[in-house]
Amino acid sequence: MVFPIEAIVGLVTFTFLFFFLWTKKSQKPSKPLPPKIPGGWPVIGHLFHFNDDGDDRPLARKLGDLADKYGPVFTFRLGLPLVLVVSSYEAVKDCFSTNDAIFSNRPAFLYGDYLGYNNAMLFLANYGPYWRKNRKLVIQEVLSASRLEKFKHVRFARIQASIKNLYTRIDGNSSTINLTDWLEELNFGLIVKMIAGKNYESGKGDEQVERFKKAFKDFMILSMEFVLWDAFPIPLFKWVDFQGHVKAMKRTFKDIDSVFQNWLEEHINKREKMEVNAEGNEQDFIDVVLSKMSNEYLGEGYSRDTVIKATVFSLVLDAADTVALHINWGMALLINNQKALTKAQEEIDTKVGKDRWVEESDIKDLVYLQAIVKEVLRLYPPGPLLVPHENVEDCVVSGYHIPKGTRLFANVMKLQRDPKLWSDPDTFDPERFIATDIDFRGQYYKYIPFGSGRRSCPGMTYALQVEHLTMAHLIQGFNYRTPNDEPLDMKEGAGITIRKVNPVELIIAPRLAPELY
């Protein structure tokens, strides 16, 4: 992130110095405040602490180092907002069990206004009637186990088609396959098919989907950019656009919304012409939401169309990006741990055989595969800091006073590598999950890859189905080696998420009979 230092510091210091001193003076907590990392500046706090520091690791790693120095509960300021970082079992349980309702809000970020349908997207919405009913719609109607069961043929067919595409790329014993790109194409195509009924193949799909894919990538970049209002949330700074990010957000949103609007109108017209309004006739997620939602939604100021588009966008974000990212790490770990890969292949060969492909109904019997997925999620959680929370009133975490309006980062990556909770925490060892009943649902506060409490990820069931089935196909269908027969580089990229810097490039060979591809 690059900040226009002179402009920001001058304007903000002049405007907020008195306010900052007044609020600091007026604080009279009954309990001690958490440790605060040193180096903060007046008014702007620690805005520059993580900026151009020469450390290109993920933010979760940097915050983990600070936890080693200052403890598992500490704070810093990003402008005016106070940020609380927790990474111990006790602190995480305090936040998501004892204080779950108090930490149920989301901080206000400008991208939520300009890119997130004015915060109508489920993961951006504040806790309240709109959020509760929208989450109920998503969990009970769109992503319920019964609904996902009805769409399992779509998942299987799409994964099968992608596996066959991967097979056609094999050219002798020396051609290199970019598995990272393949996974991104698979997951993007799968979620577009399930949401809108669109068949997408890179370079061959319709123009709308290609345009949306570009806008989607722009969204991922813009949502992580520093915007002045995020650090100094008063109306004046909503109109200050030194870096041009607001202009870029508006342009990107226009592209995204036009695609969603076209998809929505296509579905409305189809339903009117074909009279597919009866229960059970839904062909994709947009059909499902249309059949369940009234014209005006909850009296919250959002139209039906806005809520549908915001909900669809939330599903795309959850599925297309984080699922591909996680499978990519999982396959990289298996390639670098050939004994684990061989054991997983032997399990599938024994339980399923080599004359058909793994199906979703087989997953329950593939215990070692399930352990692999759990272990990958432990080492590389899809949201290493979760989506930030904000407390709606003062509370206590680990004996510390946390004032109202504090932004919460739960460092899940640090938590799930805590040597007090995990033996050999940085080692890839699926066996650790074989004899335990630890699951993904956030009730074991040392393992919360999808979050915990009322703001946990609603797309967990879908993500796990796709991850298990995709990894099972890749494990069953091919043998792998690296081009230079050296372990894959596991360098992690900078940013809020944990992305692998270098793609997973492999030489692959089929394990099954040709007629199965």
UniProtKB/Swiss-Prot annotation:
The keyword Cell membrane does not apply. One of its GO terms (biological process) is methylation. The chain crosses the membrane at residues 2-22. It is an enzyme of class 1 (oxidoreductase). Heme binds at C457. Its cofactor is heme. GO terms for molecular function: heme binding; iron ion binding; methyltransferase activity; monooxygenase activity; oxidoreductase activity, acting on paired donors, with incorporation or reduction of molecular oxygen. Its EC number is 1.14.14.-. It catalyses: (S)-nicotine + reduced [NADPH--hemoprotein reductase] + O2 = (S)-nornicotine + formaldehyde + oxidized [NADPH--hemoprotein reductase] + H2O + H(+). Expressed at low levels in green leaves. Involved in the biosynthesis of pyridine alkaloid natural products, leading mainly to the production of anabasine, anatabine, nicotine and nornicotine, effective deterrents against herbivores with antiparasitic and pesticide properties (neurotoxins); nornicotine serves as the precursor in the synthesis of the carcinogen compound N'-nitrosonornicotine (NNN). Catalyzes the demethylation of nicotine to form nornicotine. This is Nicotine N-demethylase CYP82E4. The lineage of its organism: Eukaryota, Viridiplantae, Streptophyta, Embryophyta, Tracheophyta.
